[in-house]
């Protein structure tokens, strides 16, 4: 409708200008003819007529120019309207395309989280997936999509990926030089920081050594600190791949016994702030076995040789959560306690009463008797 009205308007302008020019010419030449009279043979008269004719054609050309300019102005206005409409349509198409890409990007991210859960036997789930996506890609919205994300480790502007990087770096440095670092509280704090950043909710069966923080079970087990760091590194590497960054540096040396022993010592007999952080030990007598394990380290070499079979077995047990799970087997633990009782009896027989080693061995022997009675 608007196009039709515009077309009629321009044709009306052309017709008005044309009729005006023709009418003006008729009136002009009629008046000139009346005043000039019969055809004159005078040069001045024809000169005046030529000037008149020239002036008329100038007016006619001016009218044509004005009409052309009006037409071009109208055409330009129509082109601008068309361009604006096309731009609006293009913007709408781009917005729809960007939104679709955003939705697909989020879906692929969620699918990757499912793959990570399956990779580790569905022992955990990511607690808040939407919040996790927004932390990994803080600039992404339905109207803006970025496939890469920076890893900012500077304390003043640190982002989520930068925080994960720093948590893992601290633990890598610990693994490189664990000697002399017997501060279990420090290690617990670093591991909990990493656990909280990942925001995982455990859905597997409770195991001996699982750590609870603020009433929620974490993916950390005090008998398998390395296993937790391995899971955390795999998750971080997945984020790095998805955001177009390099993977994390690998743990060249595992934290191993140093980490497990530090965590066990820290929680052994610890009772302060149980509502904040505590270790789940549903197996009866587990703490007593831990105490025997550490007491054996204080026995002098001359007597330790008799206890070595017991110590080696306990060291293997406390090296991983799987090892501790063996203690649920009644036959296995009965054999362990019998081995311990026999080794301790040999060491006691060769130790002088009242000696430091004798007293330590006596405590170990009594603890073993209590454990045997429990079974």
Residue map of PLM features:
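Short hydrophobic membrane-inserting helices
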Residues: 1-74, 81, 99, 103-151, ...
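Amphipathic alpha-helical "stem/stalk" segments
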Residues: 81-375
């Amino acid at each position: 409708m608007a196009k039709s009205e515009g077309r009629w308007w321009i044709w009306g302008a052309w017709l008005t200008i044309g009729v005006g020019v023709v009418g003006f010419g008729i009136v002009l030449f009629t008046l000139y003819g009346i005043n000039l009279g019969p055809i004159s043979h005078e040069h001045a008269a024809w000169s005046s007529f030529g000037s008149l004719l020239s002036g008329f054609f100038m007016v006619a050309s001016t009218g044509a120019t004005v009409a052309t300019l009006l037409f071009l102005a109208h055409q330009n206005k129509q082109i601008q309207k068309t361009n604006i409409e096309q731009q609006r349509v293009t913007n709408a198409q781009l917005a729809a395309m960007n939104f679709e890409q955003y939705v697909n990007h989020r879906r692929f991210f969620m699918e990757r989280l499912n793959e990570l859960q399956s990779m580790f036997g569905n022992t955990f789930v990511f607690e808040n997936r939407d919040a996790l996506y927004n932390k990994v890609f803080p600039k992404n919205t339905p109207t803006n999509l970025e496939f890469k994300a920076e890893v900012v480790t500077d304390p003043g502007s640190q982002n989520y990926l930068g925080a994960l990087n720093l948590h893992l770096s601290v633990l890598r440095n610990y693994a490189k030089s664990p000697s002399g670092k017997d501060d279990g509280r420090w290690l617990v704090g670093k591991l909990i920081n990493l656990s909280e950043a990942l925001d995982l909710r455990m859905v597997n069966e409770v195991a001996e050594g699982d750590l609870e923080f603020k009433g929620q079970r974490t993916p950390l087990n005090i008998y398998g600190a390395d296993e937790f760091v391995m899971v955390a590194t795999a998750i971080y590497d997945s984020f790095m791949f998805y955001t177009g960054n390099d993977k994390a540096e690998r743990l060249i040396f595992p934290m191993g016994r140093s980490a497990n022993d530090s965590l066990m010592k820290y929680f052994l007999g610890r009772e302060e702030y149980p509502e904040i952080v505590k270790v789940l030990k549903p197996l009866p007598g587990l703490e007593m076995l831990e105490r025997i394990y550490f007491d054996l380290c204080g026995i002098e070499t001359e007597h330790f040789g008799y206890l070595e079979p017991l110590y080696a077995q306990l060291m293997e047990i406390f090296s991983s959560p799987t090892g501790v799970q063996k203690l649920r087997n009644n036959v296995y633990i009965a054999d362990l306690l019998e081995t311990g009782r026999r080794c301790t009896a040999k060491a006691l027989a060769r130790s002088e009463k009242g000696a430091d080693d004798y007293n330590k061995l006596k405590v170990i022997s009594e603890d073993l008797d209590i454990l045997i009675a429990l079974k």
